[in-house]
Amino acid sequence: MSEQEVLQKNNSPEGKEDRIIGKHVFGNLYDIDAERLNDKEFLEKLVLEAVNIAHMKLVEIKAWSFGGKKGGVSVIALVEESHIALHTWNEYNYATLDVYTCGEDSDPQSAFAHIVNALNPKRYQMFYADRSSQ
């Protein structure tokens, strides 16, 4: 057996391979009501709801408002499984959303869908990347 094969084997009784499960859902949201995109408290509550819906465990959440041209709100939720990041630009009616989780039990797609449904963009793009170790 090669060294590489040894490293890929798991010594668990089930014989399952030992690996990291990484699920990354991210996207761009267009043509959103500017008032919603500038409401820091609403957006922070929305991200907290998404954490719970996706079966994540919150470590800390922070939200910031940015004024001036290209201003908006950023909300970052650090979760045991990884993070949710929401960034808005109210002048452009635009937001980006990033939901990354590790582990089999979390559901980043449900968190993404919850935030998209609440913000109600006229259109959006969603992307998925498998960030697993194998």
UniProtKB/Swiss-Prot annotation:
Catalytic activity: L-arginine + H(+) = agmatine + CO2
Comment on bound cofactor: Binds 1 pyruvoyl group covalently per subunit.
Pfam families: AdoMet_dc (PF02675)
Gene3D superfamilies linked to this entry: S-adenosylmethionine decarboxylase
This protein's record includes keyword Lyase: yes
Pathway: Amine and polyamine biosynthesis; agmatine biosynthesis; agmatine from L-arginine: step 1/1
Keywords tagged on the record: Autocatalytic cleavage, Decarboxylase, Lyase, Polyamine biosynthesis, Pyruvate, Schiff base, Zymogen
Requisite cofactors: pyruvate
InterPro entries, per database record: AdoMetDC_fam_prok, ArgDC, S-AdoMet_deCO2ase_core, S-AdoMet_deCOase_pro-enz
Gene Ontology cellular component list: cytosol
Chain positions of site Cleavage (non-hydrolytic): 81-82
Major enzyme class: lyase
Modified residues (Pyruvic acid (Ser)): 82
EC number(s) per entry: 4.1.1.19
Post-translational note: Is synthesized initially as an inactive proenzyme. Formation of the active enzyme involves a self-maturation process in which the active site pyruvoyl group is generated from an internal serine residue via an autocatalytic post-translational modification. Two non-identical subunits are generated from the proenzyme in this reaction, and the pyruvate is formed at the N-terminus of the alpha chain, which is derived from the carboxyl end of the proenzyme.
Keyword Phosphoprotein tagged: no
PANTHER family cross-referenced by the UniProt entry: S-ADENOSYLMETHIONINE DECARBOXYLASE PROENZYME
Function: Specifically catalyzes the decarboxylation of L-arginine to agmatine. Has no S-adenosylmethionine decarboxylase (AdoMetDC) activity.
Protein name in the entry: Arginine decarboxylase proenzyme
Biological classification of the source: Archaea, Thermoproteota, Thermoprotei, Sulfolobales, Sulfolobaceae
